[in-house]
Amino acid sequence: MNLKNAIVGILAAGCLIVSSILIPNVANAQADNVKKSMAALIAKTEKLGAPKLEGKESVSGKEVPGLYFGKTKMTNVFDVVDEVVKENGGTATLFVKAGDDYVRVATNMKKDDGQRAIGTILDPKGPVIAKIKKGEAFYGEADILGKPYVTDYEPIRDASKNTIGIFFVGYAK
């Protein structure tokens, strides 16, 4: 019996050592993926031109300002966010500021029914909104539609440096 307990103890210690090595490496890999995806999302939109709001658009029955980069409409258009995810994995979203809310207008984030989560709003009481309202980025864990993600949220600023939307990338934990 003592030999059996010793073997179990050695195996348990080995598992702890391996997990203490692997878990930080997984977290670092996720952080690197988030940074890489955000850089890709920003680069793809910058190539299109300066961000601006123009007119009104309907997103899942909500009227919101139209989000453009240069002459390219982003509202209800998924090419850019889908390209970022195809290249890097994870999820990507563009939010537009509509009053006090930030509304998903281009995303590959899916709701429980499998539909894109366009028209849903950023949690107005969550940790992200406080940083965005200060014009700052948020990097860290966030609950998105009830699921934990490692995320990066960066303000989208117009030519006058006003925050008009948010870039988002994230990876499920």
Language model feature labels by segment:
Residues 36-55, 81-102, 139-141:
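Short N-terminal helix-loop-first-beta-strand/juxtamembrane motif that initiates sensory/input modules
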